[in-house]
């Protein structure tokens, strides 16, 4: 408990910083009242938790003097585009939010004047021009005027910063402004579905826990966990309603009190609906759920407040809940069970919870990996594309370094949105496929090109690599049943220990300038000495393969074409170091075709590419190599589509 109290002090310090930041972010507020529906009580309390969003529901060149209006974008374009104007000036903007014109006028020597004029589209807001990167990345505002004239004397990049509106309806809660509805500008310079507000004390309601935001006041719309991304679509404004759960009375609990900290040690109540743990008891913060404290409870849903930072072993063991709502303020798991493959106190917290399918996580701490190359950008584009005709390319890091989604979009005449879902080869492919099966439908294409290894082939054990990838959108868990996976809380524990040590202020709208909206990594990558090796046929258990095939079958039933290819491989490593033969390749590709329900569209030998196109590993290609390898995939994909069209 003393260790937990020290953690509590640490988190409290972070929370104070959060409060300062929250006060500094002055929202644009409106005077409105939330309109609760008939099924919501007068107090704004909801009696259930929604299942949420699980599916049930060009470059132009300017002359040295003149004005250039960019061509009208195709309907799929909702991305940050790059235009070159004159010798030095690059402008980045999103045509979904604004119209742009640029004129240049000759100056002295190589310099020239540029005038950039922006006209916002209905509902979107202009947040100013900035150089080198977006304001979200900490760059200063160069001008707030919609017509900006400046001297261009050297290479420079001008960003047009834009925002949409998130309107939060308090639904019985309170805000420092005293209003029922408050509006926040959400930066869309890069992201299309900005993160919602995390749990940093923006909205409060005495005796209640804020469970989620919802598109309907009664909680029956699309739900979004605090800090995650709601689906925005093409809207310039989205309405989100606070959904509250009434706290259980303190008399229902047994607890220990140490100073200003409370540890719950038992539960005496009989709640069968929503059991919301109080944030305070006797004026002290509830920071810990003790060993077996909530074991055997009958509640369908258990909700933890943001004050809870410690879970002890078997905290919820043998409970009947189907939904557990927690926060990422939990940074400590304690107990006697340690060591072994996935054996930790963290994994015991849900022992025997056979009905627990739904894990909801509200964000409290700042993200560590907001600009991580495996994460934020890809999932934003995937969410935006969920109702569009699309191709989703799934792989490990070979997808980051060896595939260019923009090339494929252009080659297919923009008929498809193409998402580069290359992440990491050590993340469960089963998790990705279950998630993606809820976001893909008729005429979509899944293009799966896994590196050889148990994880991408369907091993269902989760690890901290996954958590790094999803920490900016925990709502990916709304699309999966956690009973299908092992080491759920053990892997979460690993991530949270990292956060507890390294937590600092990193806002959600920061982005990586080296990754485009499609998820392509477009930095300059030169060829380098390539080492490594290849071990084929590393398949997981039959049960894991069967689960992968269940997801592929679901996609096929929904009209998705499931195509299988192979990751790019350094030819010299493959043949000279790993000593693989054509017979080895044939055996491996044959096993992939035999084990998985999909159509193999590639010859594996075609993806063994000259080592001069690889950068720092046998899987990671140079930027030129990524374009070359994408051309191979495009040819294979076109051939398959033409074959099916006959």
Regions found by a protein language model. Give the residues of each.
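C-terminal motif of bacterial Sec signal peptides marking the signal peptidase cleavage site
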Residues: 19-22
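Secondary-structure capping and domain/repeat boundary segments
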Residues: 66-247, 335
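Membrane/wall-proximal cationic-aromatic binding patches
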Residues: 69, 360-412, 434
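Histidine-centered active-site loop/cap adjacent to the catalytic His
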Residues: 615-646
